[in-house]
Structure formats: structure tokens, C-alpha cells
Amino acid sequence: VALVDAFLGEWPGAQEDRTDPAAPHEAGLLHLDVTKAAQVLGWKPVWTFAQTVRTTAAWYRDRHAGMAPGELCDRDLAAYVTAARAAGLAWTR
């Protein structure tokens, strides 16, 4: 719910809930954990939750407006790498 609310905050306007309460759920609980990546690979987040949602919403909004997916991916990847370099992450050296 927090993710959906954050996304809608980045893309205001009319929305329509098309979920089917009778449809099977993907899983009872989805739990993502980056602990192993952090311990083994030294992974650290580059963007905050808010920045990630903002960038994702912009990608979909711009795609909806007709921009090419490859162009959008290149733009966002460049922004991500720039932020990672600014944070001094080892994989950017």
C-alpha cells in the first residue's frame, strides 16, 4: 500500500482500481532482503525509496507520453551511475 500511495503521489490524476478480490494472489507475503548482497558484494543503495519511486513514475509517465523505452532506460541508468559515483561506490571506479 505504501508503494502504491507513493507512486500515485508522483503521478496525480484519476485512477481506477481494477483489482479482482476473487483473483488468486501472487503470494501471501513477498519479502525482499538485500542482506546477502550487502555482505558478499558490498552492495549499498544508491537512491532512496522516494527517489526510486519518483524515477519509476517518471519512466512510466514519459513512456505513456510516447518516449522510447530504450531512451528512458539510458537516461535513468546514467542518472543512477552518476549518483553512485557521487556516493563513491566501488563498482563505479
Protein language model regions, located:
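C-terminal substrate-binding subdomain of Rossmann-fold SDR/epimerase-dehydratase oxidoreductases
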Residues: 1-93
